[in-house]
């Protein structure tokens, strides 16, 4: 939210362009870090942060890294795959690029609740597997998925109905608004595939199994999406709609593979931390 607000301020109000977007990102990250540190240092519970007591616990660090690095790489893979799509979008001119930028800003806001539910699934599954309650862990994942579907459906209504107006917040040029509205209405109905991928990936991370979701995402968002873009642009149709559909195509492949893996995954033997 801070990033989006600062984007609007620096780009629309101050006319800073790309430089404004960069400053907005840096400031938003700094604000987030400071607020998080402040809350943790004032918290009275078991996760209170006391800087003078910071120590390395190597066994725990090894477990954190084994889960954290693949999870971080998943985020990097997503950003890296977006570069491929952006490269093809750039061929359609400045107006299309601006419309795509507006779409991605709105996209980040719409998928934020789903990403939060994914993180909640990670925590919920980890806690329940820690006490050996596999059934409750899986039940929580199902409810998180249904909730993500419901939230996405509610958010889709204003996105689909108000697509031109939402795009005009970022750029009021008619051609840009046309591209942005087209992309919003074309791609946003496919967010339900994104829900499946995010919730089940979060659940697998909570079970301490973050490598397979990383490999699935690498294959779907980088390998498959790049093959799709190359074949589509060079042999089928180098138009904005089929090129943009590389996004939901990647989501579909990723969600199908993640769901298939999750349904065949036995959680009974997963327990990241034996005793705390």
Predicted regions and their residues:
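Transmembrane helical elements of multi-pass membrane transporters/channels
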Residues: 28-32, 36, 40, 58-120, ...
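Alpha-helical transmembrane segments of multipass membrane proteins
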Residues: 4-12, 37, 83-87, 109, ...
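Alpha-helical transmembrane segments and their helix-entry boundary regions
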Residues: 21-22, 97, 210-214, 243-244
